[in-house]
Amino acid sequence: MSVFNQSRSRIIRLIFLVSFIIIIAQLFNLQVVSGKYSKLAMDNAVFPKIVYPERGIIYDRKGKAILNNAIMFDLMVTPAEVKNFDTLSFCHLMEIDTADFNKRVREAAFKNTAVRPSPFQALLKPQMQARFEENSWRFPGFALVERPIRLYPYNSAAQMLGYINEVSPADIERSGDFYRMGDYMGKNGLEAIYEKVLMGQRGVQHIIKDNHNRLVGSYENGIFDTAAIAGRGLRTYLDIELQELAEKMMTDKVGAVVAIEPKTGGILAMASGPVFNPNDLTGPDKNKNYSRLVLDVAGPLLNRAIQGRYEPGSTFKPLGALVALDEGLITPSFGYPCFGKYTACGIGKPACTHNTPGHAANLRLAIANSCNSYFTHLYRMAADNRKYGGVREGYMRWKEYLNAFGLGKKLGVDLPSEDRGFIPDTSVYNKEYRGSWSSCTNLTLGIGQDKMGATPLQLANAMCIIANKGFYYTPHFVRKIEGETLEDTALMNKYRVKHEVLTHISDEMFNAVMDGMEDVVVYGTARRAAIPNIKVCAKTGTAEKYAFLDGQRIKLDDNAMFVAFAPKDDPKIAIAVVVENAGFGGTWGGPIARILMEKYLNDNISKKSQAEYEIYTTTNKMPKHLKRLQYKVDSIRAREWFEMTKDSSYIDKYTSIDSIKNPAKKKETPGKNNRPVLLAVLPNEKIYKQRPYFFIIS
């Protein structure tokens, strides 16, 4: 071979060698150094299945699971993988149209990027889930993911336990992107307050897909998987049997019941009427059910136990007595000559049910007979107390006592949206009366009226203070967090603090008030609250109620108020009952409270109580004006729907559709008031369009 040919051969070999080295180096770079293409390949072959954790279980005081978990399925979409897709078949299977399909896919890509799985449809109904599983290979980019949902086995405690729902973009932003699209979080009740405890930690499972988009097995034996961590449980003071009794007796009623263990502040039961089944806010129909509850003018979503503001009425009188005793204004033997009405302010009000002076000859009798004149006078003595220099200073001192009893401030219960109630300060009266007012101006504060407002929780807590002779623990549900951490301890410590707000008041003074409250049950207005062989201390109340309807303030039936604790010598339960528009407190509040106290203290109820229980569970005491208000709100909503859609199906029941489509022109008569024709709209429409389920408690 010539020298020239040998050189050319070497050059060609060298070129091949260099080219081979370059190719090997590039392959090494692509496959080892850079993970870009391996990631693309993996994304096409492997589905990262999100594993949602089970939320923590909530237990009652006896260890019964009152909030548990069940499994449903979410349909997830990864928009970037939706290719070669039979959209029409998919839409037919999912019972949606193509416009809805395109909208959901676009929203998923926008909110969570095109390469991340996002919820396409949450909580599939079982039949739809089965149809999808049979055809999943036809729909690349879609997959089913298990979703633990909440299950309420006792159908009770809806407002207290709360509910969960999918996080919103605002929730994600507030969390610093801790949450992702598709995550659920507590939205109300204990679910919201203890979210960090209950939520757990999501996991990821990598699953291989075949060329037909079917999930066929774990990728690399699961070495890249992350296990989901279940949430931790809560042990509560709630007695679910007591809770069920309370809710059944509040069926078809508006009001609330709160029962507390005085020695711990643990809430034994809390019911708010109208009641509803908490399972309505879980599962595939939850949004429809939520809308129904929101549009109910009776406000079932409003937890009246902590958000309802009521005049305490005569249930306030034991508190007023303790203020007067501690200020040295009276002794237990102090009497007042009442002849049926209070005349010291010259107006003969408030009236009293008794007209013989002996019924208020001392404090014990005044409490037992609920003398309005006696307690009105005690308030005026406190407000006009000379040692404070004037009515404004005396009033503010009186108000400080009420704040110590827990009125007019948030107690700090472990539920969201607690109302503080209302005890007006002097600025309210200065503004209303232009600085010219006296203790006669607001004298009915002494009997729990005027501008005073308290929640049922505050009233029950005030009974705890009397039962404990001066102290209380912040009312709360949770007794223990499973696997308690330092952060949990910091959260729980505020419920372990003993608030000695009125322990300086002597036992003798507390005993005088408690004796009077016992007499209320023995021979007074709370005789129907008596429990054999148990000393019960109680006070009834009846508070006036008004509402605004059709632009007018109308008088409704009175609210029935009731407070109690038992046993007198070793109190184990304190209770407050409010039944709106039910009338006398002893007739409705007393028996409801007795049945609950009897059940808790004896673990059963007598035949007499059982018979009464049947009556209270089947009697409808829903305020009559709510039916009128619901009709009004629904007619306004139907009118708005017709104006937006021209769909008359919702409005026919309220008015003649012909008059809406073609309003008749009314002939005007000279000299007469020619009012416009109202079409499916009642007066003061704007008030109820803004807050359709709101009505005023006064």
Language-model segments: what does each one mean?
Residues 488-496, 612-622:
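Intrinsically disordered, low-complexity charged/polar segments
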Residues 1-287, 309, 331-334, 394-402, ...:
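Periplasmic/cell-envelope proteins involved in peptidoglycan metabolism and beta-lactam response
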